[in-house]
Each structure stands twice: as C-alpha cells, then as structure tokens.
Regions:
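General marker for long, soluble alpha-helical cores
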Residues: 1-385
C-alpha cells in the first residue's frame, strides 16, 4: 500500500470516527479536524516529540474553543489540565445524535450532474457523503462505513462512463444496504459456527482455515493469530447484532493490520499480499474468502517429529496442551491442505484421547510408546494418501 493511499485512508478513517463522535458538527469542521489529526499523527510517528506535544496542545485548545459547535460532551474535559484534557476528549462518549433526516440521496444518488463535477469537487462530494453516512450510522464500525464509501466511489466510476449515468447510480441506496447486510451475515455465520462447535473446536477450525490461507506462517504464528481471532469471537458473539458487528469488525481490523505488517516485513504469499494491498475497506471480506494457497510446497514431514508424546504432557496446563494439539493440527494441514477436515479431526481426537488415557495410566511413558506408534502410523497414512 502506497504512502499516499495510507494517508488518504488515514484522513477518511478519521473523518468517519469524527462524524460518528461529533454528529452535530458541520462538514467543514469535521473535514478540517480530520486533516489536522492526520497531520499530527504523521508528525508524532516521525519521532518529532516537541512538535508532537505542541501540535497536540494546539489541537486540544482548538477543540475546546469550538466545543459549542462540536460536542456537548467536551465541557468537563476542557476544564482539565494537560495531558488529562486530551485523554478525556479522546475517550469521551459520542455526542447525542441529532434528529437527522434520511441520507440526502438527492445530492448523492439522484443528482444528474454528479459526473460533470471537477475531480476536486467530486472528491469533496465523496468526503461529504462519507460524513453524512457516518453521522447517521454511529452503530457501524469504521471498516463497514468505508466499505459503503468504496462501493459508492466504484459505482460512480462505472456509471459516469455510461450514456445515462443517473439511471445507473440511482440504485445506490439498495447497494449500500447490501454491503451492510453482507457484513452482518459474515459475522453472524462466524458466530453461529462458534456456537455450533464450542470454543475449542472453533479454534481448531480457525487453525485449519488460516493454515490453508497462509501456510508460510510458522505453526506458532498461526496458533497465536487464530487464538486472538477466537478470543475476539468469544468477546463479540454474545453481544446483540449491532454491537456484535462493530466489535468483530474492529477486532478484525487490528488483527489483520498486524498480519499485513508481518507480510510487509516478510512476505507471506500472493493471496495475503492482495488482501493487504488491494482495498483497505474490503480487507476482512478478502481474507474471509481467501482459499488454499496452491503455490505452497511443504517440506517433507515425519509424524514422529511433530507428535509430542512425552510424559511432560501430563504436567502441562490445559492451554499448553491445546497449543501442542493445534501445532500438530497446523502441521498436518500444511502437508495435506486439500484433505477432508474430518481426517484431521479424527487424528486430533485420537491424540487427545491418547494423552488422556496415558496420563491416567500407571506407567505413562510406556503407554505413550506403545499407543503412540499407532497414532504415528495413522498420521503417516494420512500424509501418504
């Protein structure tokens, strides 16, 4: 992703956050603040600590001087000294949403002259659409709103090439609703899967899915990444539909952002690269839909090298045992990404039962040696099939 693209995403992401937080503020104030905050981020990230502190102080002074038109929630914060004032403003709750009319479609999907605007004017119009949509949908996560905005931009790009563009883009509102519905459905399906499988088996399923998508990652990286995904699902899935969507989208944004930074440092594969670089707004759906990496050639694997059948397993904490089991599962998937999932699960279940049985045996080590050979044989049979 280019530096210019990152800056645009940064400004537009800030604009969404600000429009949700300050729904009573007008567009010009929100657009100015978004630019100022993004510029301050850049200064601070470049390591200029003096300019960063001064810039932050100036920004908070400006916000407090404009609190009457920005937010009714800032008054207690603006009475505090620095640095408490800034932290208070950032963590303050969203202002009460005013009684807004429906999205002014006459300006965005019913205006016959949209395509005749200059590029600069069209860019302003797109930002204003983002502002108007965001303040009307405080319940939606930033990535979902950016998804709607991306679809709107693509719609105009396609329709403005036609003889009758208005007829083409006048269906915009239905398309926006489909984007939100699709985002809801993806999260609902994930949460339904977790409920059906239970937490442990759900994490195992994530191991299988993401090992297929990114087999170049080490088994440890895959275990940690999917553990974070499973934890996010445990936190978000019990929430109601609206909160569930926002919670999962925000969590995925952070986790996939970390994965993409890993890819930037040490490339994983073309599929991951495509999802990271192509569209920030559609990053999560892209990863959801990513299939088996057919280019990956796994180094030869001997089952006795990856199946840890030693007495110290009996002393392991439950989490350590689960991690060992999931590493084994990831190794198997790397070898046979197209094998039926039931075959993986069969070996994993046998592994768990063997550990339980041998740990209860009087001579655990002897049990592991005797019973373990059968498991290794079954494992080698899968790899050889």
């Amino acid at each position: 992703m280019s530096r210019r693209t990152e800056q645009v995403i940064g400004v537009w992401g800030e604009l969404v956050l600000l429009a949700k937080k300050l729904p009573k503020a007008n567009f010009s104030e929100i657009a100015k603040l978004a630019m100022d905050i993004q510029s301050l981020h850049q200064i601070c990230c470049e390591g200029n600590s003096v300019a960063c502190v001064l810039g932050r102080r100036w920004l908070m002074n400006y916000i407090c001087s404009k609190q009457a038109v920005l937010s009714s929630k800032f008054a207690p914060c603006c009475e505090l000294p620095e640095p408490f004032r800034g932290e208070c403003i950032i963590t303050s709750e969203n202002d009460d949403t005013p009684d807004l009319s429906p999205l002014p479609l006459s300006r965005f999907t019913e205006d016959p002259f949209i395509c005749k605007q200059t590029p600069a004017k069209q860019d302003d119009s797109l930002q204003e659409f983002l502002y108007e949509y965001s303040r009307r949908h405080p319940e939606l996560a930033v990535p979902v709103i950016l998804r709607v905005d991306t679809v709107y931009q693509n719609l105009l790009g396609k329709c403005c090439k036609l003889e009758n563009p208005l007829e083409c883009y006048s269906h915009g509102e239905e398309i926006f609703q489909r984007v939100v519905h699709d985002s809801h459905e993806r999260v609902k399906n994930l949460c339904d899967l977790r409920e059906k499988l239970g937490d442990r088996s759900f994490h195992d399923r994530l191991i299988v899915l993401y090992t297929k998508k990114a087999p170049q990652l080490s088994t440890q990286e895959l275990v940690v990444f999917t553990k974070n995904m499973a934890a996010a699902a445990s936190k978000c899935c019990p929430l109601n539909d609206e909160l569930q969507l926002a919670c999962m989208e925000d969590s995925a944004k952070l986790m996939l952002g970390a994965l993409c930074r890993r890819h930037e440092t040490e490339p994983i594969n073309a599929g991951v690269g495509h999802c990271c670089d192509d569209s920030y707004a559609f990053r999560k759906p892209c990863f959801d839909d990513l299939q088996v990496d057919g280019t990956y050639i796994s180094p030869p694997l001997s089952c006795d090298k990856v199946i840890n059948l030693k007495e110290d397993l009996c002393k392991a904490q439950e989490q350590e045992f689960q991690t060992e089991k999931q590493r084994f599962l990831s190794h198997l998937v790397k070898q046979k990404p197209h094998a039926a999932e039931m075959k993986f699960q069969s070996i994993i279940v046998d592994f768990a039962h063997l550990v339980e049985r041998c740990c209860q045996a009087e001579k655990s080590e002897m049990c592991f040696q005797k019973e373990g050979s059968k498991l290794i044989e079954k494992c080698q049979s899968l790899l050889g099939s």
